[in-house]
Structures are given as C-alpha cells and as structure tokens.
C-alpha cells in the first residue's frame, strides 16, 4: 500500500503529472506556436477552443454550488467573473470572441457550436460531468492544470505574434489576462488540495483528477490534429475553411 505523502511530496507528484501530460507536449501546439499552421487551421483551433472557454464558468458554477463554506465561495466566484465578465463586453469569453473575430470567423457560427468537432464537444462535456459528479476535492484538483498555463501562454503569444501576420497582440488579449488569473487560481487550488488530501486514498483521487483533466485537454488537440493536420478526416458538419468560406467574415 502506498504511504501517505507530505503536502510538498504531493505537490511534487502533481507537478510531475503536468510535466508529462499537460497539453503543451502535444504536437498540435508545437505546430501552432512555430507558425506551421495556415490561417484556416488556426481558425479551426480558435473556433473549437471556444467551446471549452464557454464552459469554464459553467464548470466553476457547478463547483461553487457544492461549496458550503461562504468564504470558499467568495474566493471561487471570482473565476466566474473572470470569464463571464461584468458585462457582455468584458471577461474571458468576450476576449476569446474578440480573437475569433480578429481571425475572420463569423461570431454567430462560433457561438452556435454548429461547426464543432465531436471530439471537442465530448471532451468538454466529460469535464463538466466530472466536476458535477466527483467529490469537491477532486473537482478542485482537476483545475490544477492552471499550474502549467503561464508557460504555454508565453510560448503561444510569442510564437503566434512572430509567425502569423494575421494575428495581433490586441487579438491575443485573452492570454495577457490569464497570465495573472491562472497563477492566482492555481495557487489557491493547490493550497486547498495539499490541505484536504490528507489520506492515501484522497491523494490518489486528486492525482487521478489532474490526470483526467490533462486527458481532456489532450483529447481536444487530438481531435484538431486528426481533422485539420493529418490524416485530415473532418466530421462532415464541422468547420472546414474552404467549404465554409461563406460562413467566415471577409
């Protein structure tokens, strides 16, 4: 039977999971960050990623609803504000739509979800189901992928600005905000997990939760790679840049 880890040992194990499985290791991200994708492939990435962005506040609301401690709720609810904003023109969702606008995608198409890859939809729904059905500790632990976000954000912004003349720093404003939001959120979640994962069984559960979340992010990139890189098998109802030219703004 495994021994109970100290909080710092648990953190080390969690960071090791991220180092091995976080989606910064996925080949699609290497292509994106090194300028190896064309405009249509970048559009497909942004359109599909919106489904994940759209569901982040739904995920956080599901977690919030299960918190009995008002102090904990006051901290967690900031995540919802970060993405929903205080109006329709601010927050993470609005900033992601600003990116898809800048890439030339029709906003109605993006928001409708009509052109999503099935793999994107299924991965995001699996994540929502996970945080709704698992323990609060597991749900919070699943958010720990944010520990690794600042590094990939830095790579993404620098790489996209360097290699794509159709991308501007203004279009990438979403990521600038996440550079401060993600560390704040992950620091809190990590402290919570280290404090509350106080048995061998709970420690195994939080590690499994992070492993699962990494698989959710990886699966979304798998779907994009199969459809838009190789072998190029696109779901008939999903976004296809050439075919959908009439549905993409000029």
From Swiss-Prot:
Q: Does the keyword Cytoplasm apply?
A: no
Which Gene Ontology BP annotations are present? pyrroloquinoline quinone biosynthetic process; sulfur compound metabolic process
Q: In which pathway does it act?
A: Cofactor biosynthesis; pyrroloquinoline quinone biosynthesis
Coiled-coil parts of chain: none
- Identify the keywords attached in UniProt to this record, alphabetized: Oxidoreductase, PQQ biosynthesis
Provide the E.C. number(s) assigned to this enzyme: 1.3.3.11
In terms of Gene3D superfamilies, this protein maps to: Heme oxygenase-like
Establish whether keyword NAD is in the entry.
Answer: no
Domain of life of the organism in this record? Bacteria
| Enzymatic reactions | 6-(2-amino-2-carboxyethyl)-7,8-dioxo-1,2,3,4,7,8-hexahydroquinoline-2,4-dicarboxylate + 3 O2 = pyrroloquinoline quinone + 2 H2O2 + 2 H2O + H(+)
What is the enzyme's class at the highest EC level?
oxidoreductase
UniProt-listed HAMAP family: PQQ_syn_PqqC
Xref: PANTHER family: 4-AMINOBENZOATE SYNTHASE, PQQC-LIKE PROTEIN
Its biological purpose? Ring cyclization and eight-electron oxidation of 3a-(2-amino-2-carboxyethyl)-4,5-dioxo-4,5,6,7,8,9-hexahydroquinoline-7,9-dicarboxylic-acid to PQQ.
What family does this belong to? Belongs to the PqqC family.
Q: Give the protein name, as stated in the record.
A: Pyrroloquinoline-quinone synthase
This protein's species is Xanthomonas oryzae pv. oryzae (strain KACC10331 / KXO85)
Gene of this entry:
pqqC
């Amino acid at each position: 039977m495994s021994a109970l880890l100290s909080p710092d040992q648990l953190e080390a194990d969690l960071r090791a999971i991220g180092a091995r499985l976080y989606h910064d290791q996925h080949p699609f991200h290497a292509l994106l960050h090194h300028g190896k994708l064309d405009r249509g492939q970048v559009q497909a990435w942004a359109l599909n990623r919106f489904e994940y962005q759209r569901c982040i506040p739904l995920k956080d609301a599901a977690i919030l609803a299960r918190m009995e401690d008002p102090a904990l709720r006051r901290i967690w609810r900031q995540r919802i504000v970060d993405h929903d904003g205080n109006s329709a023109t601010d927050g993470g969702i609005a900033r992601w739509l600003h990116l898809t606008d800048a890439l030339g995608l029709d906003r109605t198409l993006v928001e409708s979800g009509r052109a999503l890859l099935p793999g994107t939809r299924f991965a995001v729904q699996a994540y929502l189901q996970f945080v709704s059905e698992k323990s609060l500790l597991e749900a919070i632990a699943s958010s720990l992928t944010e520990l690794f976000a600042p590094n990939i954000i830095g790579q993404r912004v620098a790489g996209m600005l360097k290699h794509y003349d159709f991308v501007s720093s203004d279009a990438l404003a979403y990521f600038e905000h996440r550079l401060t939001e993600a560390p704040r959120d992950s620091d809190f979640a990590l402290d919570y997990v280290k404090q509350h994962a106080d048995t061998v069984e709970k420690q195994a559960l939080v590690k499994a939760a992070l492993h699962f979340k990494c698989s959710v992010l990886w699966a979304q990139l798998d779907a994009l790679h199969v459809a838009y890189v190789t072998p190029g098998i696109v779901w008939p109802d999903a976004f296809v840049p050439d075919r959908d030219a009439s549905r993409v703004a000029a």
